């Protein structure tokens, strides 16, 4: 039972027999909580259960939770590979009680597992308790029979857990394993506790209080249990290892890396092998859970992890992308426990391969500069932070890679000067923006925003309203009037016109008043929330304080609403068909079309597109109500609203819900699609009419785009397609239904004619028909006692040239055959064949190279009995053949 997979199974089965529900690991991207970078503990998926927001039928659970700690306060990245127990990715084994059992049973379960199931000797175990937790102290004595000296009271916060400033909290009890007195270090609570002799293997959290305010706690009516045991740590103990990287799982990965790179697992590159093994796990699992490398948020953390591993791959001598070639080894070791790894294997490989291919250029350039700038430094010196910033800012070389590259030489980086350079660059960027060509205009808008405040938007409820002109702007300057025929901008006290944002185009329409009319051609948002209406005065003269009737183009707005709602449905349908990794990267919501950009590594098949379209249209046909409501941001997250990590949200957000769903989240029923969105939408899904996907393409590496039509534009497109089909069917003298069969028959007929034509060309190439052609004598001449068949032909492909040369060799019996084909664009291709009895005298490769030179080409390749080449000048085909004859005769 000492293997990692066996230990994991034994843990889960042990608690399963005790009435615990074995719950699958939650994703590394926490559901409905964009404030948390990654899942970093087993209790994360049960947070709402512990706080009482969510109810569970089973009050006991056990998990093996995949975790990542590589961002924010939980950042182990710099230490990974250089210590025995630091990891970016790890598995947290845990058992949980939600108001069911408490300390006594938790301690009993833990002690029996590690001593009876795992067989750890009692004399090598000790525990800690919170200094004030007399109950836990007494229970350890009673259940485990431990002496007082093996139950250590810890007065610090290390043994008291809190979820936050308020909420559930309670004392902890940690179980430690003694690796032996041959390893430096003292027990917890001693001055030598930071040594490696005593290692924590399990933490039991006793949630028994509700913290109202700092220092003010009330007992919870139903105390709970949350425990966490690092799988890698307990595996090391059970396998008799002091170092996590020596366990079977890591050793299997390290062997795979060593086989590819030739590195010695115990040699000077030991740390690099460990870095790659750890980072391969973190990168692969993050990609499987939908995170892709980018320059922000979770994607940036992933990119840092990947690039650090790639840097160490180069240290091992890898000259080609390495990590993607190791995914199979990880899937072999962990795929059974985590099926999502198996499903995502192709995407993981492709993502790693593309990222490493791109990064190698950055890495090579950065390392050259780094070597130049640090060549005079010696161990203990400090590398200039300004130069480190230049590497980062100009060459895209991350700071942590600079630190990592210098670490082996004992050189540190001046972080203070790096930070100063970063701050100066940001200040310079702000100043540069202030001096841009839009300065005057932007200054006007910020001034008006400060003077007038935010524009009140009425467009969610109405498309017609009354407003008063608050300001007029022309050519970037505030003006007192706009005359008929003049173009300018109007700012109002309130407006039903939607301003372009979130991918949705701005509204158009008209504004009318006493003797005046203004045509709105565009609506923009300036200075964050100032609505600016651009257009032309069609009648009269506009002045501030003019009262106007504001009318949005209803037909256009209706089409835009349909397209925006359709993007939400397509987003969810894409997730259902392609996977949960789908995340929006951009969109366009216009009157006549929509496009939606999203994270995905490969083209979408026609079948997948049809499934996406069908799923979205099913929701359209259900004609469900579309609800939009303002909610507190925390409530919106609890309701399952999709929120992009890195987006900044205010205290109140707008939640758009579409379609029915049987899923429940606490007391909130989720819709089929639930997103945070500030755009305008249809009232019922049926108002969309029809969704028709018209195209799919790549936008950037790892980003795909679908384009679609809705409503009347989709109908018009469908009608046009029907008209085209009818016209085509008429031209083919068949019906639309029979057109595929008719086209297939025509294609078969065409292929047959093409084959017949190719055969005719081959016969011509070999000298036409007749007996001479049949025995291979047509066009044959003797050169230096050797039969030579040399012909220039047209309209024959290179593959057919090869078959003709093979045929000619058989017919000649003994000789050399050379055929040159000239293509439509004037290029020449040549194939030379030599019969077996002559290859000792003539090499087809040598002969074809001489011909290639005449055609303007270089080289040529093949075998002594068959070779091919080409050149740009097919007009010299005969000269090329003469060169071969000369070589044979010479």
Curated annotation (Swiss-Prot):
Cofactor(s) listed in the protein's UniProt record: Zn(2+)
Compartments, record wording: Cytoplasm
UniProt cross-references to InterPro entries, sorted A to Z: aa-tRNA-synth_II/BPL/LPL, Ala-tRNA-lgiase_IIc, Ala-tRNA-ligase_IIc_anticod-bd, Ala-tRNA-synth_IIc_core, Ala-tRNA-synth_IIc_N, Ala-tRNA_ligase, Ala_tRNA_ligase_euk/bac, DHHA1_dom
GO cellular component labels: cytosol
CDD domains named among the record's database cross-references: AlaRS_core
Chain's role: Catalyzes the attachment of alanine to tRNA(Ala) in a two-step reaction: alanine is first activated by ATP to form Ala-AMP and then transferred to the acceptor end of tRNA(Ala). Also edits incorrectly charged Ser-tRNA(Ala) and Gly-tRNA(Ala) via its editing domain.
Record-given protein name: Alanine--tRNA ligase
Organism whose genome encodes this protein: Rhodopseudomonas palustris (strain BisB18)
Gene name linked to the record: alaS
């Amino acid at each position: 039972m000492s293997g990692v997979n066996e230990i994991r199974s034994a843990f889960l089965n042990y608690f399963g027999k005790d009435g615990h529900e074995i719950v699958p690991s939650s994703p590394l991207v926490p559901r409905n909580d964009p404030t948390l970078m990654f899942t970093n503990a087993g209790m994360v998926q049960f947070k709402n259960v512990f706080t009482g927001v969510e109810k569970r039928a089973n009050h006991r659970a056990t998990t093996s939770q995949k975790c990542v700690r590589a961002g924010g306060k939980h950042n182990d990245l710099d230490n990974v590979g250089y210590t025995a127990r630091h990891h970016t990715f790890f598995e947290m084994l845990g058992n949980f009680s939600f108001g069911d059992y408490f300390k006594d049973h938790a301690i009993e379960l833990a002690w029996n597992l590690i001593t009876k199931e795992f067989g750890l000797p009692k004399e090598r175990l000790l525990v800690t308790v919170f200094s004030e937790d007399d109950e836990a102290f007494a229970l350890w004595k009673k259940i485990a029979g431990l002496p007082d000296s093996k139950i250590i009271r810890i007065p610090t916060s290390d043994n008291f857990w809190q979820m936050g400033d308020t909420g559930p909290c309670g004392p902890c009890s940690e179980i430690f394993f003694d690796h032996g007195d041959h390893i430096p270090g003292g027990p917890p609570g001693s001055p030598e506790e930071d040594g490696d002799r005593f290692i924590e293997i399990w933490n039991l959290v006793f949630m028994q209080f509700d913290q109202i305010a700092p220092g003010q706690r009330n007992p919870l009516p139903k105390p709970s249990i949350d425990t966490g045991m690092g799988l890698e740590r307990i595996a090391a103990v059970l396998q008799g290892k002091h170092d996590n990287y020596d366990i079977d799982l890591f050793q299997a990965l390290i062997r795979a890396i060593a086989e590819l790179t030739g590195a010695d697992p115990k040699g000077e590159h030991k740390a690099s092998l460990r870095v790659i093994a750890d980072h391969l796990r973190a990168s692969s699992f993050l990609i499987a859970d939908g995170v892709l490398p980018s320059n922000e948020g979770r994607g940036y953390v992933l990119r840092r992890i990947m690039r650090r591993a790639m840097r160490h791959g180069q240290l091992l001598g890898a000259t080609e992308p390495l990590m993607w070639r190791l995914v199979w080894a990880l899937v072999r070791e962990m795929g059974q426990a985590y099926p999502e790894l198996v499903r995502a294997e192709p995407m993981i490989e492709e993502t790693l391969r593309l990222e490493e291919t791109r990064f190698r250029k950055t890495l090579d350039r950065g390392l050259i500069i780094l070597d130049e700038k640090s060549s005079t430094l010696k161990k203990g010196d400090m590398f200039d932070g300004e130069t480190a910033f230049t590497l980062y800012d100009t060459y895209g070389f991350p700071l942590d890679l600079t630190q990592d590259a210098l670490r082996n030489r004992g050189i540190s980086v001046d972080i203070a000067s790096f930070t100063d350079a970063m701050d100066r660059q940001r200040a310079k960027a702000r100043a540069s923006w202030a001096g841009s060509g839009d300065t005057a205009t932007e200054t006007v808008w910020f001034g008006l925003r400060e003077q007038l405040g935010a524009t009140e938007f009425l467009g969610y409820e109405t498309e017609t309203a009354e407003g008063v002109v608050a300001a007029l702007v022309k050519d970037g300057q505030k003006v007192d009037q706009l005359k008929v025929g003049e173009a300018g901008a109007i700012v109002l006290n309130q407006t039903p016109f939607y301003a372009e944002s979130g991918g949705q185009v701005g509204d158009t329409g008209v504004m009318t008043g006493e003797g005046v009319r203004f045509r709105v051609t565009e609506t923009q948002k300036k200075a964050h929330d100032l609505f600016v209406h651009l257009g032309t005065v069609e009648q009269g003269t506009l002045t501030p304080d003019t009262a106007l009737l504001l009318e949005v183009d209803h037909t256009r707005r209706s089409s835009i609403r349909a397209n925006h709602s359709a993007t939400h449905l397509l987003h969810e349908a894409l997730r259902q068909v392609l996977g949960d990794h789908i995340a929006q990267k951009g969109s366009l919501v216009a009157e006549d079309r929509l496009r939606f950009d999203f994270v995905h590594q490969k083209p979408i098949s026609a079948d997948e597109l049809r499934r996406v379209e069908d799923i979205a249209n099913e929701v359209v046909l259900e004609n469900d109500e579309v609800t939009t409501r303002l909610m507190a941001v925390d409530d919106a997250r609890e309701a399952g609203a999709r929120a992009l990590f890195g987006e900044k949200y205010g205290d109140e957000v707008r939640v758009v819900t579409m379609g029915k769903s049987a899923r429940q989240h606490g007391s909130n029923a989720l819709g089929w699609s639930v997103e945070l969105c500030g755009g305008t939408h249809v009232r019922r899904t049926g108002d969309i009419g029809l969704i028709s996907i018209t195209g799919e393409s790549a936008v950037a590496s790892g980003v795909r785009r679908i384009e679609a039509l809705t409503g009347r534009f989709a109908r018009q497109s469908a009608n046009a397609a029907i008209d085209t089909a009818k016209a085509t069917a008429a031209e083919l003298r068949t019906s639309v239904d029979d057109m595929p069969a008719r086209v297939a028959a025509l294609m078969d007929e065409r292929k047959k004619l093409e084959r017949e034509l190719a055969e005719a060309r081959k016969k011509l190439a070999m000298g036409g028909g007749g007996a001479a052609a049949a025995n291979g004598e047509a066009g044959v001449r003797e050169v230096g006692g050797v039969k030579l068949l040399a012909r220039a032909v047209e309209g024959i492909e290179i593959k057919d040239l090869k078959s003709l040369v093979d045929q000619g060799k058989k017919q000649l019996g003994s000789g050399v055959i050379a055929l040159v084909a000239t293509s439509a664009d004037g290029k020449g291709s040549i194939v030379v064949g030599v019969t077996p009895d002559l290859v000792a005298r003539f090499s087809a490769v040598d002969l074809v190279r001489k011909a290639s030179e005449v055609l303007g080409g270089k080289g040529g390749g093949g075998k002594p009995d068959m070779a091919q080449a080409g050149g740009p000048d097919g007009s010299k085909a005969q000269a090329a053949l003469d060169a071969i004859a000369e070589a044979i005769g010479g």
